[in-house]
């Protein structure tokens, strides 16, 4: 349990510490909502320093379909009208790892009951949503990668100028000194 709590705390710390104190940062969160990412998403939405302009789903803690459903369910819980785009269902090159149901439960949210959402994800893919949003707001949108970075790689393949138009990319990218995201693809 200590490793899991440390992992959650590190995720939230990295998310909030990455942004300046004075400016409200506009972000797209690219996420595989398990219990840890769900907490980070809710903290970001509640923060007066962050404006979440979109959520993208990705495989990782759960499969992409469930990640999309979980993102929509979380947004309904807090009555947040934020668009959700469904992302890649597999890595570009590496073998897809099994989902850690022993940590996040079969539903990805720790087996707590959260009502299904009546909302749907955008018709755009996550990569298309990233490109459209960043290129329409050059230098204003940051990307927060809480899961695998496949959607960001696909967005860069669609629009190489994305690299010079995104404000910054903040990636969780693994853990230190605790069990967790310590694999060759973390």
Model regions and ranges:
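Bacterial N-terminal signal peptides that target proteins for export
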Residues: 1-10
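Hydrophobic h-region of N-terminal signal peptides that target proteins for export
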Residues: 14-22
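Contiguous, function-dense segments enriched for cysteine-driven chemistry
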Residues: 9, 13-14, 64
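Active-site histidine-anchored catalytic micro-motif
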Residues: 24-30, 35-73, 106-108, 112-186
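A glycine-rich helix N-cap at a beta->alpha junction
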Residues: 78-85
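Surface-exposed loop and adjacent secondary-structure segments within mature catalytic domains
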Residues: 85-117
């Amino acid at each position: 349990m200590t490793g899991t709590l440390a992992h959650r705390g590190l995720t939230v710390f990295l998310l909030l510490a990455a942004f300046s104190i004075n400016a409200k940062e506009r972000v797209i969160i690219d996420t595989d909502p398990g219990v840890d990412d769900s907490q980070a998403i809710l903290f970001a939405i509640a923060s007066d320093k962050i404006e979440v302009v979109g959520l993208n789903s990705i495989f990782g803690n759960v499969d992409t379909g469930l990640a999309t459903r979980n993102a929509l369910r979380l947004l309904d819980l807090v009555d947040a009208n934020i668009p959700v785009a469904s992302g890649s269902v597999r890595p570009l090159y590496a073998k897809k790892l099994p989902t850690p149901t022993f940590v996040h439960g079969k539903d990805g949210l720790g087996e707590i009951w959260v009502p299904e959402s009546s909302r749907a994800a955008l018709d755009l893919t996550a990569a298309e949503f990233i490109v459209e949003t960043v290129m329409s707001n050059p230098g204003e949108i940051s990307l927060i990668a809480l899961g695998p970075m496949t959607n960001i790689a696909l967005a860069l393949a669609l629009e190489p100028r994305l690299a010079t138009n995104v404000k910054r990319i903040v990636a969780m990218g693994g853990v230190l000194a605790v069990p967790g995201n310590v694999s060759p693809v973390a």
